[in-house]
């Protein structure tokens, strides 16, 4: 819920017989409030095997739909920022993982597409993606002969402002948090390293601290200062 508006997200996998259906196309368009989603509100992406539907409702008029959209894509995760909705999914090309991110703006219940971006690696923790001051911060792990970790800083048009790589190569990001202008994340090893990255300048993120923590960690939680 943002202000007077509630945003509802649903996701449904597409069955094989639906992808080969040759009958009346109108019969397979999902319904919102017993009405078909308008064609102008449907986005189709590559490798579509699921239907993501977003609906907004004004709590002062709960029986009316303010806006709706359907995105045909791969199975997605959702991150909701202060004024944008981000859908992200993993795609494999030649045995390498990539993350596709699509941005939709929202305001007073209305939603519209902005841009998409593909970055190397996979988002391995729900807290590894975060938006602040119109900057999207994304931590990924790429598996290859030796795994690689990267931090991407994307502007409001989904263009890469800055990038940090070469962080704990050979390991995988297990947990992440963004607190103020610092990105914290833990990579997996017998002794888990905790990294702190200064992201105050989105064009030049830099590692400012590293701490070895004995044991296994897959969650970071902020506690005061």
Predicted regions, residues:
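Beta-sheet-rich non-transmembrane sensory/scaffold domains
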Residues: 1-225
């Amino acid at each position: 819920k943002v202000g007077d508006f509630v945003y509802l997200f649903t996701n449904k996998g597409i069955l094989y017989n639906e992808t080969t259906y040759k009958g009346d196309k109108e019969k397979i368009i999902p319904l919102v409030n017993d009405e078909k989603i308008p064609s102008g509100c449907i986005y189709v992406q590559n490798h579509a095997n699921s239907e993501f539907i977003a609906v907004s409702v004004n709590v002062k008029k709960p029986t009316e739909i303010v806006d709706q959209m359907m995105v045909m894509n791969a199975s997605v995760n959702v991150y909701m920022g202060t004024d944008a909705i981000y859908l992200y999914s993993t795609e494999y090309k030649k045995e390498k993982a990539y993350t596709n991110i699509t941005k939709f703006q929202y305001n007073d219940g209305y939603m519209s597409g902005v841009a998409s971006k593909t970055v190397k690696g996979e988002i391995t923790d729900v807290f590894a993606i975060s938006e602040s001051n119109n900057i999207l911060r994304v931590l990924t792990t790429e598996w290859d002969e030796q795994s690689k970790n990267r931090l991407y800083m994307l502007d409001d048009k989904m263009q890469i402002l800055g990038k940090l790589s070469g962080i704990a190569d050979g390991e995988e990001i297990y947990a992440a948090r963004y607190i103020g202008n610092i990105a914290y994340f833990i990579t997996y090893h017998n002794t888990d390293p905790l990294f702190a990255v200064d992201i105050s300048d989105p064009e030049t993120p830099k590692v400012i601290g590293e701490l070895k923590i004995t044991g296994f960690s897959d969650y970071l939680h902020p506690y005061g200062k």
